[in-house]
Structure formats: structure tokens, C-alpha cells
Amino acid sequence: VACSGDADFIPIEAQPEPGLSMPPAVEGPFPVTRVVDGDTVRVLIEGQDTSVRLIGIDTPETVAPNRPVECAGPEASVYAEQLMSGEDVYLELDASQGTYDNYNRILAYVWLEEDLMVNLAMIDAGLAEEYTYDDPYTYQQLFQEAEQDAKDDLRGLWGQIC
């Protein structure tokens, strides 16, 4: 879906989710080397530039070969850059999703702080849809509720941006 975009679009400021905190089993911190798009980031792990796909979300395409840039894709990418560029992140794996996807990207929840998860922040801003690949995942219900809230409030994809 192509769209004209909204140059004045500013997503909501990322807010911690009450009662949600980074679990003790996270890995990191890892420096972000590049934000690829709204749901993929590259981080430095043991000297290797490694691609990470955020679990449970799907953002509009901006870099897929042979596909047009989708509505709100640039905005999702910019917001992800605002959240993660120059930051150190922590990765939480989810056994239900496996370690890698079909493109050899690590599958993870990406945490910026003790109580701020990027995956959820993207949905809260209305710049990502909840996405279940095959099996249910740890934060599925929370992500689905956040998506419904974004829809109800007409944020991002569900507002005037598209």
C-alpha cells in the first residue's frame, strides 16, 4: 500500500509499560550498528555485526527488494532509528519462536531500558502491527492489546498517516 505520508507525523513518545520489566535472562548490552527498518536492527555481538528481527511485530516495508515502500514504512523506520540509533540494547529470546528466522536473523524482544521494550513501543505508536508467525509467543496478548489501543486512538497506521 503506497501512501503520500505525513511529513509532520510525530509518533507518541515511547513510554514504559506499567508492570512490564526486562527479565533477568536477557543478553547484552549490545551496541546498535544500524537500524535497517522498523522491525530489523543490526547489533554488534562478540565483534560480529548481527541482524536481529523483532519478535511479534511487522512494520510496513521500506527496504524489501521488488516491493514498493508501504504506507507508514518511512515513519516506522525513522521512529525505530530515534529509539535505537547510537544506543545499547538488550535481547530477550523466546524459546517458542526459535533463535533464528529464515533469513538467519536472531529473533528477539529488544529492550532499551529496564522497562522499555522497542517491540511494544513500535506497536504503541501505531507503526507496527502485532504479528504472529506460527506459534504464540510470550508477549502476544500484550502486543494484541497495544495494537487495539493504537487502532482505537487512530495512531500511526490507523490514523491520518495512511
Regions found by a protein language model. Give the residues of each.
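Small beta-barrel nucleic-acid-binding modules, primarily SNase/OB-fold domains
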Residues: 3-162
